[in-house]
Amino acid sequence: MKIRPLNDKLIVERQEVENKSEGGIVLTSQSVKKSNRGKVIAVGLGKRFENGERAAMEVKVGDQIIFNDGYGVKTEKIDGAEYLILSESDVLAIVE
């Protein structure tokens, strides 16, 4: 299935967090916090203004990002894989 985000939305694949502590202890899934880093899979065309123009998107496909994993972030399963749908405003940084 192909998915195309609208407006200023992004499709992101969450990066997994390592399940070992710094001391080498294997952590249970309950004690491992979900990562707020991911890889951008798809990007919308940008937010549309009332005059019909669109804001240019700063985030591009393939970017590694740090995002705010808050209320506006939606989780969807697509072809058995889990993806996040979020707004560009939820992106805190691009990792270079």
UniProtKB/Swiss-Prot annotation:
It is found in: Cytoplasm. GO terms for biological process: chaperone cofactor-dependent protein refolding. Its main location: cytoplasm. The keyword Signal does not apply. Keywords: Chaperone, Cytoplasm. GO terms for cellular component: cytoplasm. GO terms for molecular function: ATP binding; metal ion binding; protein folding chaperone; protein-folding chaperone binding; unfolded protein binding. The keyword Phosphoprotein does not apply. Transmembrane segments: none annotated. PANTHER family: 10 KDA HEAT SHOCK PROTEIN (PTHR10772), CO-CHAPERONIN GROES (PTHR10772:SF58). Belongs to the GroES chaperonin family. Together with the chaperonin GroEL, plays an essential role in assisting protein folding. The GroEL-GroES system forms a nano-cage that allows encapsulation of the non-native substrate proteins and provides a physical environment optimized to promote and accelerate protein folding. GroES binds to the apical surface of the GroEL ring, thereby capping the opening of the GroEL channel. Heptamer of 7 subunits arranged in a ring. Interacts with the chaperonin GroEL. This is Co-chaperonin GroES 2. The lineage of its organism: Bacteria, Pseudomonadati, Pseudomonadota, Gammaproteobacteria, Vibrionales.
